[in-house]
Regions:
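A structural motif detector for short, solvent-exposed N-terminal "entry" segments of globular domains
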Residues: 409-455
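Exported/periplasmic cell-wall-interacting domains
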Residues: 417-419, 452, 457-465, 480-656
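C-terminal motif of bacterial Sec signal peptides marking the signal peptidase cleavage site
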Residues: 26-29
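Intrinsically disordered, low-complexity acidic Ser/Thr-rich regulatory segments
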Residues: 73-75, 226-302, 541-584
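Extracytoplasmic
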Residues: 78-80, 87-89, 126-128, 291, ...
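SH3/SH3-like (including bacterial SH3b) beta-barrel domains
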Residues: 94-110, 277-292, 359-372
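Bacterial N-terminal signal peptides that target proteins for export
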Residues: 2-17
């Protein structure tokens, strides 16, 4: 049987991290229609037209991406002087004063063009410098005109040429996050049963360092669109994840990078910029719990004085022992670019046991099995047999509504569509997302919305429904495993907060007491099977327990989790909140307080409700959507607030 089918890649998953902010933006009114027209009879039409063309394969290749034009990153300098960011985030203000409106923020290590001289020094000893395209940054604590500053050379901005902006890894065993290279004796004192751990690691090293092809192995064009049948070598961009060395997979330039200059001699030549503050004499700043997702920018091996261990460098310039983390690559799954030959309506297979059917004389007959997350063009017809709805493919087979998610034209159009503007449509029932330019669909994919489906979002993990606009966009930020974020309109629960201070908090009045947002734990009904480690993370971390049940103020049987400095928990847990952090969750776009579109590198069940309220996208899809929506993040910036200064946010319509 030859079905009108587009093969889409299914893969496995991962973990990560996030902290952002919400800037005010109004929601435009529009009417949303049902995903499919009413069942008017045995051959009722699916809403919308269809080309009926058989489509080619949109394969996930072991390739990397070309840099989409206009992406944030180091801004081209030309002959202009530059301003370098020396704190983890530096706020961009509309006017040269720290009480002015916040337009966005920059990330450590970034260099952006600046005015030749400061425009003023009110409240800023180093002076306020104008940067492009708008705004002012204070030189001093957060930024410098000295481009030889050690921290600028030590840090590394996100890589936006690939689907994931950093290398990522998950914590396999509780670990200290060192601020300098520890000696052997210091490691034995800081890490429980270290000798036993190292013995186990050396016996299992090949297995625990193994990776699969992932998001950064997908070939994408200059717009971030997946390229069919293109492999990494064909694009001339280097090696695949499975060909890279262990050091490369942890963010290193090579597999044998030396100890960085700022860590030579067992000392630290740059300040600690992490959210866990130290007094200068400590050897580590906080601990990371099992399943924590880390973003990495480098790696190096040590000599016998440090047990010969390799250390990875986190994005906030802390060190983690490589024996206690496992690199991962995110899901290579992605959606489809649409064109005249491939357009709506489409059906994505959401069940791993799906089959096609024939309907003969009103009786349903089983035909061939269907590939999980493959996509099929539909001819606009549907039938209902014994209470089950079936959709007709363009090559005259039937698909059960129980097995697929539909991407179809809406019954009614929002005003932005009528005016030819960009807008996003998300169906919670179908778990699909479509990018529209006016009434032309340009991209379609599967997503994971809230676990609670169509329940009331105010009292559950359901995704909010309605019409919204993108409020702010972040290249990456930190979340906890309940996907609470200090910049998402809810109280921060996992430490940090610098990103929220930088982006602003215009939605405190709208914050809900319970955190919606995507989680690493899914309880929804699903045909999809979460990959290995993710299945464990879904149940939370049961491997670590509080050191004491009884502390002052504790109710009978209640465990009090320390707010800071606990040897086992550090600042990574709060009562009633997530148990581990997901650092630098990529491509976050908030459209409502506590609700965002973002990449999820910790799971691979897209097409199944999974989150705590956010809309999870595969990394390749999140990258594509992020650089398609408005407002664009200016070159060199890490986040931007939508509004009259930086541009109106793209419309987002979420419906059943």
């Amino acid at each position: 049987m030859t079905l009108a089918m587009v093969r889409l890649v299914g893969a496995r998953a991962l973990t990560a991290a996030l902290i952002l902010g919400i800037a005010g933006a109004g929601a435009a009114a529009c009417q949303k229609g049902p995903a499919v027209g009413a069942d008017a009879g045995p051959d009722a039409a699916v809403s919308g037209s269809v080309t009926g063309a058989t489509t080619g394969a949109a394969s996930v290749a072991s390739g990397a991406a070309a840099l989409p034009s206009g992406l944030p990153g180091d801004a081209p300098a030309g002959d202009r002087p530059l301003l370098g960011v020396t704190s983890f985030v530096a706020t961009v203000y509309k006017e040269p004063r720290d009480t002015a409106k916040k337009l966005g923020y920059l990330r450590v290590g970034t260099r952006v063009p600046r005015s030749a001289e400061p425009v003023g020094k009110a409240g800023c000893a180093g002076g306020w410098y104008a940067i492009e395209p708008h705004g002012y940054v204070c030189a001093g604590e957060d930024a410098t005109t000295d481009l030889d500053a050690p921290i600028l050379k030590a840090s590394r901005p996100p890589n936006l040429k690939t689907a994931l902006p950093y290398r990522y890894a998950f914590v396999r065993a509780v670990l200290p996050m060192y601020v300098r290279v520890p000696t052997a004796d210091e490691q034995y004192k800081a890490e429980f049963k270290l000798k036993e751990h190292l013995d186990w690691y050396h016996q299992n090293e090949a297995e625990v360092t193994k990776v699969a092809l992932g998001a950064n192995d997908v070939a994408i064009d200059e717009r971030g669109v997946p390229v069919a049948d293109k492999k990494l070598g064909e694009l001339g961009l280097g090696k695949s994840s499975q060909e890279l060395g262990f050091g490369n997979m942890l963010g290193g330039d090579t597999d044998a990078d030396p100890v960085p200059f700022w860590l030579e001699g067992g000392k630290r030549a740059i300040p600690n910029i992490s959210d866990f503050k130290t007094k200068g004499f400590e050897i580590f700043a906080d601990r990371a719990r099992r399943h924590t997702g880390l973003s990495l920018i480098g790696s190096f091996a040590t000599g016998p004085e440090s047990l010969g261990r390799r250390f990875a460098i986190t994005a906030d310039l802390r060190l983690v022992p490589a024996t206690k983390i496992k690199p991962d690559t995110g899901s290579p799954w992605h959606g489809l670019e649409l064109a005249d030959a491939l357009t709506l309506p489409l059906a994505f297979v959401r069940s791993q046991s799906a089959r096609s059917y024939k309907i003969v004389h009103g009786k349903v007959q089983t035909a061939d099995s269907l590939d999980y997350r493959s996509a099929y063009t539909l001819n606009g017809k549907m039938r209902t047999v014994e209470g089950v709805r079936y959709y007709r493919t363009t090559d005259k087979h039937w698909l059960s509504a129980q097995d697929v998610g539909l991407a179809v034209p809406p019954a009614t159009w929002p005003d932005d569509a009528e005016k030819g503007r960009k807008w996003i449509e998300i169906s919670i029932t179908n778990q699909t997302l479509v990018l529209w330019e006016g009434k032309k669909p340009v991209y379609a994919t599967l997503v994971s919305t809230g676990q609670a489906g169509l329940d009331d979002p105010k009292h559950s993990t359901a995704t909010v429904r309605g019409t919204f606009r993108i409020r702010n966009k972040h290249v990456s930020a930190m979340m906890d495993s309940n996907e609470s974020s200090s910049v998402g309109g809810h109280a921060n629960t996992t430490g940090g907060g610098s990103a929220r201070a930088a982006i602003g908090d215009d939605d405190r009045s709208a914050a809900k007491p319970a955190s919606p947002a995507t989680a690493a734990a899914g309880k929804g009904k699903t045909h999809a099977k979460a990959g290995g480690k993710d299945a464990k993370a879904a149940k939370g971390d049961k491997g670590a327990k509080p050191k004491a049940d009884a502390k002052a103020g504790a109710a009978p049987g209640e465990k009090i989790i320390p707010k800071r400095g606990d040897g086992e928990y550090g600042v990574t847990r709060r009562r009633g909140e997530g148990t581990f952090q997901l650092r630098d969750v990529p491509y976050i776009q908030y459209f409502e307080s506590g609700y965002a579109l973002h990449a999820a590198y910790w799971h691979d069940v897209f097409g199944t409700p999974r989150s705590h309220g956010c809309v999870n996208l595969a990394p390749v899809d999140a990258h594509r959507v992020f650089f398609w929506t408005d407002p664009p993040v200016p070159v060199g910036w890490h986040a931007v607030n939508a509004g009259e200064d930086m541009g109106e946010g793209t419309l987002v319509v979420l419906h059943e």
